[in-house]
């Protein structure tokens, strides 16, 4: 599926915002931020990885391995925010400060997102390569554009 070209400065701006939103996460090892952007470049939802609403933030729930059972991923939180606010994500793009896992990739596809923009994988993230490769396969086979931006170029473009 071809996507209308967006000037690289917009990718950089939106990825910078995902970093700010990632800072809202209480996850001690990896904060992740996501934003959903309409085709006319309007931010329609944000999300960060965190515990469910009303669920008490305790250290043991945010540590491995417990966090894998309790933490809602940033991308899913952004999609849920769309649902809660009555905003359709169909045809939108999602920007994430970390490449979506395969479960989030499936949710992104099912929600009708047309493109995913994230950072290039860094060496420190290589343990996630298998999951990310599955995500890329889901996007490719489902016709969702997947774009990786080198992290060192974000912030260079104003």
Q: Language model features by range: what are they?
A:
Residues 1-158:
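Zinc-dependent deaminase catalytic domain
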């Amino acid at each position: 599926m071809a996507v209308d070209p967006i000037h690289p400065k917009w990718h950089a701006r939106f990825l910078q915002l995902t970093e700010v939103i990632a800072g809202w996460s209480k996850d001690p090892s990896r904060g992740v931020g996501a934003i959903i952007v309409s085709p006319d470049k309007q931010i329609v939802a944000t999300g960060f990885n965190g515990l469910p609403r009303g669920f008490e933030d305790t250290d043991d729930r945010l540590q491995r391995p417990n966090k894998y059972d309790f933490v809602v991923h940033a991308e899913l939180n952004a999609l849920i925010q769309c649902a809660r606010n009555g905003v359709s994500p169909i045809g939108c793009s999602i920007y994430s400060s970390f490449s979506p896992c395969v479960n989030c990739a499936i949710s992104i596809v099912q929600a009708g997102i047309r493109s995913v923009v994230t950072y290039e994988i860094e060496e420190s993230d290589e343990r996630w390569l298998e999951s990310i490769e599955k995500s890329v396969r889901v996007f490719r086979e489902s016709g969702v554009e997947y774009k990786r931006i080198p992290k060192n170029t974000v912030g260079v473009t104003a």
